[in-house]
């Protein structure tokens, strides 16, 4: 074939690779979701298989089996050798149901609960109002019935993996009893206590969420070290008797005035010398990134009245609330890239 005679792309023109990758991002997430919901990774955990065997195990046609296997291999979820497929280390660890770090619940929660609001992201940008559907938008988004149980279940592993890195990165040797405010189903405090045998604490959340936390705490064998306290942190005083308060992935749900109120309530419950720990995906102080924090902030735009904030903003709020020795500790995890900590004067 003769070479083309056209002039081609002018020198210096950037390739559109970034745009095609962004435009088709949904294809990747839905491929992962389809693989989880059809049981692909669970099926391959029983042994490698070719396309016809995979189709038989999943009860699907050979054509979709081949396409799904190829896509998952291209995405780094499967390995292929001589026409046979098996789970990669990542898939084997995180995507097989029943294993301790199973991540599929989070993926399904995003697909079923979070995605509908994202499909109306332009509306959220134009109206400055959440677009994520809730049964009763006039009620608190966290009240019973306004968030499905799958939300709390899906976040459990996500929160556990985040807490694991927090526990390894932040010095908690001087803390004896910690209060996890807005602690959900208890994943964060369970993991912190698992990593630090000297710790005990309290999960504070709404009554129906505390019921879920109680079940998880019992299943983890932590009932002697972790209790629950039902409270609305905007309306009720927080329980005393703790020397640290943790706010893990909480303040991004609310606006600045609400967050200042939450911090004031936390400090009221602490003795002098007690520590407040804010664990979040921190936006860079110049608001240029990073990607995970910036996109989580977009997630807050479509789902809440909050946003992700900078470390500098949290530092100012803690100091204004009466904290000294404010510092930031950085680490990498699914739900946080750092902790901003302050000591009550």
Curated annotation (Swiss-Prot):
It comes from the Bacteria. The active site is at 252 (proton acceptor). Its EC number is 2.1.1.302. It is an enzyme of class 2 (transferase). S-adenosyl-L-methionine binds at residue 205. One of its GO terms (molecular function) is protein dimerization activity. Inhibited by different divalent cations, such as Mg(2+), Mn(2+), Fe(2+), Cu(2+) and Zn(2+). It catalyses: 3-hydroxy-5-methyl-1-naphthoate + S-adenosyl-L-methionine = 3-methoxy-5-methyl-1-naphthoate + S-adenosyl-L-homocysteine + H(+). It holds the Pfam family Methyltransf_2. Belongs to the class I-like SAM-binding methyltransferase superfamily. Cation-independent O-methyltransferase family. O-methyltransferase that mediates the formation of 3-methoxy-5-methyl-1-naphthoate from 3-hydroxy-5-methyl-1-naphthoate in the biosynthesis of the antitumor antibiotic azinomycin B. This is 3-hydroxy-5-methyl-1-naphthoate 3-O-methyltransferase. The gene is aziB2.
